[in-house]
Amino acid sequence: MNQNRTGGVSKVKNKSAAPVQITAEQILRVAHENQQTLPKAPPKQVITDQEELEDYRLRKRQQYESLLGRNRKTAAIYIKYAAWEESQKDLTRARSVFERFLDIDHRIPTVWIKYAEMEMKNKNINLARNIWDRAVCLLPRVSQLWFKYTFMEDMLGNYPAARAIFERWMQWKPEPQAWNSYLKFEQRLKLFENTRLIFEKYILVHPYIKTWIKYTKFEERLGNIENARTIFQRAIEFLGEDGNDEQLFIAFAKFEEKYKEIERARVIYKYAIDHVPKSRAKDLFDTFTNFEKQHGDRIGIEDVVLGKKRFQYEEEIKKNSKNYDIWFDYLKMEEINGEIEKTREIYERSIGNLPPTNEKKHWKRYIYLWINYALFEELISKDMERARSVYSECIKLIPHKEFSFSKIWILYANFEIRQLNLDKARLIYGQAIGRNPKSKIFDQYIHLEIELGNFDRVRTLYEKYLEIMPDNCDAWCKFAQLETELGETVRARAIFELAIQQPNLDRPEVVWKDFIDSEIQLKQFDFVKQLYRKLLEKTNHVKVWIGFIKFVHSIKDKQQQKQRQQQQEEDGDSNTTKKDGGDDDNNDDINKPTREIFIEAHKSLSNSDKEERLLLLESWKEFEQTFGNQETLNQVLKKIPQRVIKRRSDGNGGIEEYFDYIFPEEEKSTQTSLKLLEAAQRWKKLKQQQELQKQQELQKQQQDS
């Protein structure tokens, strides 16, 4: 047993021959086929004397000339041709090839570079110098040529010539990379005065902030602090409004901070905050904040942060004063800061920005400014009279004829409740119901009176509620539930009876369900059956039938359990076993009412949707599997429809497949219709044959005549 579980390579269990055998002949054939597909290398040519060499050169030159004849302007062929001539040590011919192409097109830098590199490789420095000179004269805007030219002179140690080339290049005002190369060249030679002169030209040609900062860093590396400071000041004056960039001021302030000039740095930061547009000063504020954290006190840091945020919010408000999200953020910051008067001032400014139209979608955010204002006065400033005034002014401002907000009425009433002004709170709720009654207001008012125990007032409110909104199912159900909890079952039943008689309920199924559940809790089973019958008269829905069936079966099940308990109490445990065996024989009698309702439902739904009929049959099948026998189950299985796949047009010129169900009673009618269709097709085919024969006879008669 354990030997088969040891590690290592597993043994072959099946040692019989494989069904397909591979022979050596097959292996050789495949290898030969693969070998034939490989590309064959050209044969090596061995040159033994000068005559063969000249012949080889002649053929090679003829090949290149033939290529050039077909591709006269292709630079790559000329470069390869010249490289081959160079490999043959025939530089004259190589130069001739390059010159031929340059006569055709001198605007390709690669050809000039290859030409000059060939001369440099063969140590023809003067020739290379002439080529570079010609190239930069013809193509002065190609930086690569200048770089190569200066690099050659630099490598040769000919620094005056390299400097002269740089000067010629700078006259063309090239990109910053060229100036940086010139600066590195002079710094490498430690000619710092020359470097300063180059920087002075550089900042005029490219008057960018990066250029000025690079100039200051150069002076700083040399230890000329005053010169660096002067350059910063020159940059701010020279650039003017263009110099109002945070990076220049940050670099200047960090420079002063580095050399312990803290007050200078602080002045620079404050000057920058006043002059740099705040939309471009994010890093400036962050850097200033970090600076104050290192060198300032807590008050200074907080002032910096608050000043930054205030300015940002004010800028946003200038752009769009109707952007209420900005107002919310601004007010939240001021509330945290704790300045009551400042916060109150901003609240007054914010509520002055009325929405553009009297549409509720524009007021939804705006109304929260008033709500937050009232809560601020109540909870933070503790000014109750001002809070009451805010609520009152807000209610006056809302166009109640067009729309209203339940939330503001409820908050106002709750505020008065917290001030123990119950009469005032009732008055507010009454005004809300009179102006624009809504479910939330009724619910809150009713909840208040329930908490106070004024049930007569609650009944009055529910009556008013249902008078205004008779289609509100929740109101009917809550009213009936209240009466049930108070023990007034007759009142509750009457309310439900009135509710189900309403023609336009928004969710009638909720009322029926609560009515039925209420009567089940009261154990009025006969009345529940009557309710189900009434509901089925209104709607012949499969879910109602299934609910009715489950209810009837649950009653019978409870009655059966009661009988068993009584028998156990009377006869004892020994006789219980016998009785239980007898109960199995009476299952059919107990389940008979449930089965009868299934049959009734099946007949009632015969003209309904097939999906609903199938749902009922599936429920019936589960019932018979659990409580029935094989005979009753087979009767249900015979009624189960057959699912088939059909096709129909999807309305867009296409065909879609869908599932359909064919019930057993429909199969007979379907078969009859199919037979009629087949007979019609046979008759049509016979008629076509007869017409064809007549046409053939007519054609024969015409031919004979």
Swiss-Prot record:
HAT repeats lie at residues 55-87, 89-121, 123-155, 157-188, 190-221, 223-258, 260-294, 304-336, 338-372, 382-418, 420-451, 453-485, 487-521, 523-554, 597-629. Gene3D superfamilies: Tetratricopeptide repeat domain. Signal peptide: none annotated. Identified in the spliceosome C complex. Keywords: mRNA processing, mRNA splicing, Nucleus, Repeat, Spliceosome. Its main location: nucleus. It comes from the Eukaryota. Belongs to the crooked-neck family. InterPro entries: HAT, HAT_Syf1_CNRKL1_C, Syf1-like, TPR-like_helical_dom_sf. Residues 559-591 are annotated as: Disordered. Involved in pre-mRNA splicing process. This is Crooked neck-like protein 1.
